[in-house]
Amino acid sequence: MACTKVSIPKPYGYYRITVPDTAYVPFEQQYPAYPYTFDLSANAVVQLQDKEPYWINIYYPSLDATVHCSYKSVRKNLRELTNDALDFVYRNSSFATSIPEREYNHPEANVHGVLFDLEGNTASSCQFFVTDSTRHFFRASVYCNCPPNADSLAPVYEYLRKDVIRMVESFEWK
């Protein structure tokens, strides 16, 4: 009996993720020609996208996460743009445990939109769109560059969610 080794299962270990403190800078300081502005995290790097005018990625190097942002001019196609944004959200619905929605209305800035929290092991943890309903439409979605695991990525998701909420609440058309 003394020669027999007893196997003991070992628990899975995960990296400890520490999220940085954040400060914000106006997006328009770096990109004054864009038709929108919002508060941008000082921990993020804006990557311009040449697929379409005014498309950007907001990359968080310390978290290896990206907020993919697209902009479209509204040309009597608001319903189509809104439906496309909703399609992107609900493509993840089979993996989401729930998708709470939060409406945003800032009449003084003519900004109206919806924020979606995709809970569970989804590729995108948070998405939103905002519009003025006549000229501008902006959509964004958050992605981490790793397999989705809501439990281990919870600190990252919460940090990015707070940044996205700050984006939406400070969003303005120019």
List each language-model region with its residue ranges:
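Surface-exposed amphipathic alpha-helical segments
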Residues: 44, 141-174
